[in-house]
């Protein structure tokens, strides 16, 4: 249980709130499609391959500018708590804004849409896109579920989580 940079190695895996839900659903034999905006680079390509490996559909992923968002997890041990460092600035989803997703295409054949409180916490424009996604889903009579997934260290752009999540839950 080494602390950050006590080891010369970092282990890289793909994950994230909504992606983890999609993988879990696919593991239970349910159809799951992942909707997000990813950069056009080899790391994003590897992420897409990983989702496909677990049976998650990726045809609704939009490719855009920016980079992959990263978080670093330092596992805790005994009295030392776990620690997470988020590096989401300039990621594709942090740069995403309303209008970047074709909702007719994204929600075609969809009857359930799941979102977490992590995406709207990343940036103000990602928050606006998140609110747009929920409104567009409801407009199409798609069931919306939301895991608040509060991450204090992500809410840095001036809006409070309680304010935004209340709006998403309407």
Q: Where would I find each of the regions flagged by the language model?
A:
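Short pre-catalytic strand/loop immediately N-terminal to key active-site residues, enriched for Gly-Thr
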Residues: 5-15
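Positively charged, low-complexity intrinsically disordered leader regions
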Residues: 1-3
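Alpha-helix C-terminal capping segments
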Residues: 20-31
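Glycine-centered short loops/turns at secondary-structure junctions
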Residues: 29, 55, 139-141
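Conserved beta-alpha-beta core of the PfkB/ribokinase-like small-molecule kinase fold
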Residues: 112, 118-170
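Conserved N-terminal subdomain of the carbohydrate kinase-like
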Residues: 31-117
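Conserved donor sugar-nucleotide recognition element shared by glycan-biosynthetic enzymes
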Residues: 14-18, 43
